[in-house]
Amino acid sequence: MILGDRDLKYYLEKGWIKVEPIYGDSVRENGIDLRVGNEIARFKKTDKVFDPDNPDYSFFDVQRGEEFIISPHEHVLLVTEEYMKLPNDVMAFVNLRSTFARLGLFIPPTIVDAGFEGQLTIEVVGSSFPVKIRRGTRFLHLIFARTLTPVENPYQGKYQGQKGVTIPRFKL
């Protein structure tokens, strides 16, 4: 079952779903919009090979700021302003807001698992021209779905509780 605006307001009021900060225009007809945060991680251009068994995080350049320019076809990791927490019977589909998709920006299919808590880090792929994004701009739209029963194994992965832009983590 997809949660509509009334459902979402009720879940937020009861504290079953937490999104902080939440703004007057965040809850939409069938989801919640999330905003651009203050950090981005750029993928450095290199001919070196990244080895997940021996991760070298110098491949990433983490930047803080109020605005960012995403270069043509550049891949970046972007953090949301909001910190969220989902109950064990709600998951969310992450979508790019249509306005940014119409500019040629792209995000891969992304799901927020039931039981997740933290800020979202999302991959964004640049358009055919540079695009400026500003902190606080509504950028993502989350569609929440309730599972028929609470999940048996709520999310407890390596990104649980993440704050700030989070580069890939590998268990060694």
Swiss-Prot record:
| Any one GO MF annotation of this record | dCTP deaminase activity
Enumerate the active-site residues: E123
| EC number(s) stated in the UniProt entry for this protein | 3.5.4.13
Q: Which GO terms describe its biological process?
A: dUMP biosynthetic process; dUTP biosynthetic process
Q: Which Pfam family, any one, appears in the UniProt record?
A: DCD
Instruction: Name the pathway it acts in.
Output: Pyrimidine metabolism; dUMP biosynthesis; dUMP from dCTP (dUTP route): step 1/2
What is known about what this protein does?
Catalyzes the deamination of dCTP to dUTP.
Entry protein name: dCTP deaminase
Q: Native species of this protein? A: Sulfolobus acidocaldarius (strain ATCC 33909 / DSM 639 / JCM 8929 / NBRC 15157 / NCIMB 11770)
